[in-house]
């Protein structure tokens, strides 16, 4: 949400409640995660996330596959909704190296771009640009393009080179996020090593299924700084059940170090599954880099 009185961007989190009304509300996606707070179905989760919406205030929706009852709930709230794929669009260039965002400005469609790809998803960038326009900010297209093309966010499709090896770090910890990670993986001529681990409330089997054959070798590390972490051996059994190759290690750090030892310059190492997983690897890289 955007709170203009406070001059701040406010992320509501999974409990979706703040003390002030929203000038602009954003629902980026609706999928299964945090079910203990939000509900057991996409329909329940969608309605829960709409707790950020306000009557006669802009609501920006980035979920292309709306769950049952979502549109009716938006109508009941009376928010001024704009939807990705309908009101807001992303147009990729032919070689997918850049994209253009189409937003609504005073009822008219406005293009911003082309912008070079960065570690943030074009759809989310489009939502952010629309949020600024909806909040009353005047955007300079050239400045937006230069700024966005240089953006990066730690742990979100973050690409780094470590000891000559291409490493991608992403905090994807549910099947929907794993699918997005898979769809945005670079094509390499070598192998893809996965360094992964998750907490106990995550759909690990669904994550493994989404990553599928895009991973050649799974290196499962034990998360040791959170009691909710699943046992690495249990995670490995799921990998084996899915007919994939893998092994487990006493720590995420050990799993990552082994992946770097085995990988060549033609390979890539992807790190995902939890904020704890990515954090452990970032610590290793900062100490050994």
Model-assigned labels for residue ranges:
Residues 1-11, 17, 22-112, 125-142:
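Acidic, Mg2+-coordinating active-site environments of NTP-dependent enzymes
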Residues 2-26, 30, 44, 108-217:
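Nucleotide phosphate-binding/pyrophosphate-handling subdomain across enzymes
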Residues 19, 30-37, 145-148, 219-239, ...:
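Flexible, gly/pro- and Lys/Arg-enriched active-site loops
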Residues 50-59, 188-192, 214-217, 265:
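Short, surface-exposed connector motifs at secondary-structure boundaries
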Residues 60, 64-69, 73-82, 166-169, ...:
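C-terminal helical cap/extension that packs against the catalytic core
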Residues 62-63, 73-94, 114-119, 142-151, ...:
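Beta-strand->loop->alpha-helix junctions that form or flank phosphate-binding loops
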Residues 274:
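Active-site-proximal loop/hinge segments that shape catalytic or ion-binding/gating pockets
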